[in-house]
């Protein structure tokens, strides 16, 4: 595995791979690698001859009250995990190389990024999309793999790629979960042992929503009421939002209609740790 820190070197390496007709896949991370990231790398390796892993803790997608300074940065451990997973190139630039002093341009992500995570974290999606665009250009990837746990982020990236006619296919990968259903996340390390036990209410609430769906309940208000009850059973849980949206446009819906994919979106603070998760809800025509 080759480790690259310089953006110009990364771009030249990617150009050389393209000239050799290598199919390139990129997996973008902020480091602190875990099983979820490894599943993205595995998916990339199944589809590409060359896999680039990027590790970059992007200052532009953290708000002033968020955890940029304390975000874990175990680069040596990450590099070892990446090597074992079969990554070909690890691109780990310093922030000043991605955002030099003269850097001025930023992506404006528009309507899809104004709600939910966008409302809770102003500027987050613009900062995220800016670095994703830059990393797509530097990696020259044919394919980019992102986790479905960050569902709104995935939707914003797909919208940007469509709008700018970027010749990279965006592939969503299923959320990887612990044995008790908690979505694997780098931020889980912030949870105390008691908070970790309580964090399972996110997955439990999604299971409750699906139970209601099987009972032919399609009223979103009633489903969310039940979801909220499950989450509220955890004494340290504070709900930021719990809502159901149409997966195609991230707009809230009142009634679930047949054969349309909806997402139950959750953002919940357990103690001081903010967790997000989502699950697909779909009513089949035969169940109506």
UniProtKB/Swiss-Prot annotation:
Keyword Nucleotide-binding: yes
Disulfide bonds: none
GO CC entries: cytosol
Keyword presence, Lipoprotein: no
PANTHER family assigned to the protein according to its UniProt record, in alphabetical order: CYTIDYLATE KINASE/PANTOATE-BETA-ALANINE LIGASE, PANTOATE--BETA-ALANINE LIGASE
More details: The reaction proceeds by a bi uni uni bi ping pong mechanism.
Protein's name according to its UniProt entry: Pantothenate synthetase
Organism: Chlorobium phaeobacteroides (strain BS1)
Taxon lineage: Bacteria, Pseudomonadati, Chlorobiota, Chlorobiia, Chlorobiales
Gene name of the encoded protein: panC
């Amino acid at each position: 595995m080759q480790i690259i820190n310089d953006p110009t070197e990364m771009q030249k390496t990617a150009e050389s791979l393209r000239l050799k007709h290598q199919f390139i896949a990129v997996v973008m991370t902020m480091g602190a690698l875990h099983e979820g990231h490894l599943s993205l790398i595995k998916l990339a390796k199944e589809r590409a001859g060359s896999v680039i892993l990027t590790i970059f803790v992007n200052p532009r997608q953290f708000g002033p009250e968020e955890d940029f300074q304390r975000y874990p940065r175990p680069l040596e451990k990450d590099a070892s995990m990446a090597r074992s997973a079969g990554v070909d190139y690890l691109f780990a630039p310093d922030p000043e190389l991605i955002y030099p002093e003269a850097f001025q341009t930023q992506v404006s992500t528009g309507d899809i990024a104004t709600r939910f995570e966008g409302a809770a974290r102003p500027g987050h999606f613009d900062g995220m999309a800016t670095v994703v665009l830059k990393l797509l250009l530097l990696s020259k990837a044919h394919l980019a793999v992102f986790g479905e746990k960050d569902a709104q982020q995935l939707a914003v990236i797909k919208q940007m790629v469509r709008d700018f006619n970027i010749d990279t296919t965006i592939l969503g990968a299923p959320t990887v979960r612990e044995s008790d259903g908690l979505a694997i996340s780098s931020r889980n390390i912030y949870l105390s042992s008691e908070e970790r036990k309580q964090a399972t209410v996110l997955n439990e609430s999604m299971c409750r929503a699906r139970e209601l769906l099987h009972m032919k309940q399609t009223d979103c208000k009633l489903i969310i009421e039940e979801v909220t009850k499950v989450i509220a059973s955890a004494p340290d849980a504070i709900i930021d939002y719990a809502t159901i949206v149409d997966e195609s446009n991230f707009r809230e819906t009142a009634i679930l209609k047949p054969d349309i994919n909806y997402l139950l979106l959750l953002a919940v603070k357990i103690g001081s740790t903010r967790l997000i998760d989502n699950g697909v809800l779909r009513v089949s025509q035969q169940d109506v």
